Amino acid sequence: QNGRTTVFPEPSKNFMTGLGALPYALDTLRPLDAIIIMLGTNDLKEHTAQASVNGVGTLIRTIQTFDQLYPASVPLFGDNKPRILLLTPIEIGENVAEWDTLYGKGEESRKFPALMKGLCEWLDVEMMNTQEIVQPSKVDGIHMMPEEHRKLALAVRDRLLGLVKA
């Protein structure tokens, strides 16, 4: 779903947070082999990259403690081996329209890889720096063009296969 934040509700869409959707999605989809998280860009509309990464940390800790928070006959991860892959948000380009709430947030978006690396080391989860793999569209500076989606999908596939086989 486009427009989702990590944990910060937007006044016009207070239901569009990752934290709000996560418990229902996890409980409905269990058991899982792995979980991929890629959130953060929309947080920059009103918050810093550090605040966004703190929100991602809340999501990861929710996943890591899900079975204790919401016990069920089927564990969240079928083999009780949590596999979480965090993808950094892509860089926000320089050609974002002045009217867009993400205008001028490129520098802040480039902080995600270093901040998320520290978080992932602390919480013992895998990370992939998408900013080394794909570029934002020249059209809006925020989204990816189809060829960039393909590059990212192939990179995630390879990383995920290695993670699940481990």
Question: Where do the model's predicted regions map?
Answer:
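Conserved SGNH/GDSL esterase-like catalytic core that processes O-acyl groups on lipids
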Residues: 1-72, 77-78, 83, 107-114, ...
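Short acidic/His/Gly/Ser-rich catalytic and metal-binding motifs that mark active-site loops
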Residues: 2-4, 93-97, 135-138
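Extended, charge-rich low-complexity interaction segments
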Residues: 26-30, 116-120, 161-164
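Hydrophobic/aromatic beta-strand patches that form the interior of the parallel beta-sheet core
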Residues: 36, 85-87, 126-128
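Short, well-ordered beta-to-alpha junction loops that form the rim of enzyme active sites
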Residues: 39-40, 88-90, 131-132
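Alpha-helical structural signal in soluble globular domains
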Residues: 58, 62-66, 115-123, 155, ...
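Substrate-gating cap/lid alpha-helix
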Residues: 70-71, 92-130
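Histidine-centered active-site loop/cap adjacent to the catalytic His
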Residues: 126, 137-166
